[in-house]
Amino acid sequence: MARWNICSYCGKPFEPGTGKMYVRNDGRVLFFCSRKCERYYFMGRNPRKLKWTKAYQEARLQRGKR
């Protein structure tokens, strides 16, 4: 059974056979669940500033749910 991948940008798990795998020149492998995540990553957007990402939700818990 194939394992589920986790999006490198938003942190959402997604099914095998969907999404995109991107391999950088240094050998690091990035998985993207959608074109939106892929585009935001390559534009240099910080996932901690976008409410729909897991990184934002974790950062929010650390800073005290303002």
UniProtKB/Swiss-Prot annotation:
Residues where Zn(2+) binds: C7, C10, C33, C37
Any matching Pfam family: Ribosomal_L24e
GO terms under cellular component: ribonucleoprotein complex; ribosome
GO molecular function: rRNA binding; structural constituent of ribosome; zinc ion binding
GO biological process, alphabetically ordered: translation
Keywords: Metal-binding, Ribonucleoprotein, Ribosomal protein, RNA-binding, rRNA-binding, Zinc, Zinc-finger
Source organism superkingdom: Archaea
Function: Binds to the 23S rRNA.
Co-factor note (free text): Binds 1 zinc ion per subunit.
Signal peptide residues on this chain, from the entry's feature table: none
The protein's required cofactors: Zn(2+)
Family: Belongs to the eukaryotic ribosomal protein eL24 family.
Gene name, Swiss-Prot/TrEMBL: rpl24e
Subunit field text: Part of the 50S ribosomal subunit. Forms a cluster with proteins L3 and L14.
Keyword Ribosomal protein: yes
Cited HAMAP family: Ribosomal_eL24
Protein's recorded name: Large ribosomal subunit protein eL24
Zinc finger region(s), C4-type: 7-37
Keyword match Zinc-finger: yes
